[in-house]
Amino acid sequence: VIINLSSLANKGKFNLKWQGEYCFGETWIAFRGMSAENNLHAHAALQLVAGAGITVTDDNTFEKQGNGWLIPSGVKHRITTSSPIVILLIEPDSFFANALQPSQQKGSVVQSLSLEILDTLLADIPLRDMMNKLETLYHQNNSVIDARLISAMTYLNSIDKRPTVELIGKHVGLSVSRLRALSTHYFGVPFSKIIVWKQVNLAFQSLAKGASLADAAYDAGFADQAHFTRIPRDTIGVTP
């Protein structure tokens, strides 16, 4: 799903005046466009950022300048640039994140992106096509996905509101524990983590249609508005 973020900013749904579009996946979210100067912050997601003349400032006010950076999970940072950028935020425990961040490079230091990743992120193609290419290149688990997990993912993507592990498991004939095990085997994360990313996606879609924060939180299955506000902030560093 592609969501125009500028429309949300114009409706007063976000404090940050980002101008561009979002694209969601099972364990990631991609943004392309103009970013606003943000405060020093950290989030759970592994972050990749690409563009012209990007300055990344860390918690020690040390600045790095370049065209592409990998920011590990939990590292405080600030990104500034006057040019359009691409940002990719990924569930840090997923196979996708592990493939993009080889074990020898893991740590708490901002690192330069490889030329292959940088070229893919900056390719002049639709955002979804760019992500499909990146996932094809860096999907670590190449085994054939279990048909039951495919059914669970299909059902998750077909429902409009309030997804739960119990609901998805019942629909495809799997116990909660079995669905968790299958998801962890194929994606590297339990199915509950995939649902969180889906909930953020659903909430953003509701906001794009004009829903209030409270209604968007309800539509996506968050406990309340405060829960919805906290999850995107902690996960991807964006506060609705």
What kind of region is each of these model predictions?
Residues V1-N15, A208, R230-P240:
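…primarily DNA-binding HTH/wHTH and HhH modules…
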Residues G12-Q104:
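N-terminal regulatory/effector-sensing and dimerization cores
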Residues A30-G33, K133-N141, R180-G188:
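Short, Lys/Arg-enriched N-terminal segment that forms or immediately precedes the first helix
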Residues F96-I159:
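Amphipathic alpha-helical segments enriched in hydrophobic/aromatic residues interleaved with Lys/Arg
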Residues E135-T164, H171-V172, K193-A211:
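A short, Lys/Arg-enriched amphipathic alpha-helix from helix-turn-helix/homeodomain DNA-binding modules
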Residues E166, H185-A223, T229:
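Terminal helix-turn-helix DNA-binding modules in bacterial transcription factors
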Residues S177, A226:
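Key DNA-contact positions within bacterial/archaeal DNA-binding proteins
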